[in-house]
Amino acid sequence: MNKDELIIKNIIKYINELDLITKDKDKTFFFDNTSEFNKIINRVIKIGESLSKVSDETKNKYSNINWNIIKEKALDEEKVGYEMNVKDTYDLGSKLLKEELYEKLNEVI
């Protein structure tokens, strides 16, 4: 197993963890519960960092995968920094990463 496959397995693991954390909960729950919201943020950060470590070769080979999904959601209005509100973080944690990455990443490994 190569380095990218290990990274992708970790991303899949983090997405599964997010799925468990957000299951049957809405944005309001996380807005009112800082420790649970921090769990989502932690996993989203780990996924973003892991996505950035995947080699360009793999990213080019699997160009159907949006490797920048987190960066795209986190860009501020000036497109120079990163910020996420509760809604963006919840959306990433509860559905976007599962819908946009999970199956495609499973095809890679």
Language model: regions and residue ranges:
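Solvent-exposed interaction patches of small proteins and small membrane subunits
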Residues: 1-109
